[in-house]
């Protein structure tokens, strides 16, 4: 190289802190999008289970009824799922109690299956009265928490989610947005809080698993650097 020539500066590299913040923001956005679409999908599936009571096949009128129902329900469920799924690992970090119970995808998928089963039971199983149905679903929902979560923060958030979601649903029904066929608890069905509680636990488990995967990826990248 000649004496008069100067070495051109290479591309500017971001510091480790900026790179970490950027990657965390991107991962947070990706987790939110994934949770949103999972919530939308579950909302469509559970809506089908509620509509097709005593229907074993999928006739055209049942399929059409999914898309003719209120269009805003799946996006609202997706948004709520994203918020819940991001909130659970955030609360775990702030409490300093990382959730380590049954942290694998097979357990998460079983939790989703049990949640769908609880919803299916609410639509298909006939009881003598609604109190028996509500108590049974409450026991199943608490059993879901005990089997797949067992954290105090998870139980507390599940109860809070059930209360807020039931309150919002009551306000929507009261204002005539939609209605239940046989309301027995302040314009809604008495088993509804159990469904919301189980849904909060399920989305929390999915959010925790996604957050754990993100931590593994970040740790591997920092180790390579």
Curated annotation (Swiss-Prot):
It holds the Pfam family INSIG. The keyword Protease does not apply. InterPro entries: INSIG_fam. One of its GO terms (biological process) is negative regulation of fatty acid biosynthetic process. The modification Cysteine sulfenic acid (-SOH) is found at residue 215. Binds oxysterols in a pocket within their transmembrane domains and interacts with SCAP via transmembrane domains 3 and 4. A motif (KxHxx) lies at residues 219-225. Phosphorylation at Ser-151 by PCK1 reduces binding to oxysterol, disrupting the interaction between INSIG2 and SCAP, thereby promoting nuclear translocation of SREBP proteins (SREBF1/SREBP1 or SREBF2/SREBP2) and subsequent transcription of downstream lipogenesis-related genes. Polyubiquitinated by AMFR/gp78 at Cys-215 in some tissues such as adipose tissues, undifferentiated myoblasts and liver, leading to its degradation. In differentiated myotubes, Cys-215 oxidation prevents ubiquitination at the same site, resulting in protein stabilization. Oxysterol-binding protein that mediates feedback control of cholesterol synthesis by controlling both endoplasmic reticulum to Golgi transport of SCAP and degradation of HMGCR. Acts as a negative regulator of cholesterol biosynthesis by mediating the retention of the SCAP-SREBP complex in the endoplasmic reticulum, thereby blocking the processing of sterol regulatory element-binding proteins (SREBPs) SREBF1/SREBP1 and SREBF2/SREBP2. The chain crosses the membrane at residues 29-51, 71-88, 104-126, 130-148, 154-175, 190-207. It comes from the Eukaryota. The record marks 115 as: Required for the recognition of 25-hydroxycholesterol. Interacts with SCAP; interaction is direct and only takes place in the presence of sterols; it prevents interaction between SCAP and the coat protein complex II (COPII). Associates with the SCAP-SREBP complex (composed of SCAP and SREBF1/SREBP1 or SREBF2/SREBP2); association is mediated via its interaction with SCAP and only takes place in the presence of sterols. Interacts with RNF139. Interacts with RNF145. GO terms for molecular function: oxysterol binding; protein sequestering activity. It is a multi-pass membrane protein. It comes from Sus scrofa. It is found in: Endoplasmic reticulum membrane. There is a cross-link at residue 215 (Glycyl cysteine thioester (Cys-Gly) (interchain with G-Cter in ubiquitin)). Its main location: endoplasmic reticulum. Keywords: Cholesterol metabolism, Endoplasmic reticulum, Lipid metabolism, Lipid-binding, Membrane, Oxidation, Phosphoprotein, Steroid metabolism, Sterol metabolism, Thioester bond, Transmembrane, Transmembrane helix, Ubl conjugation. This is Insulin-induced gene 2 protein.
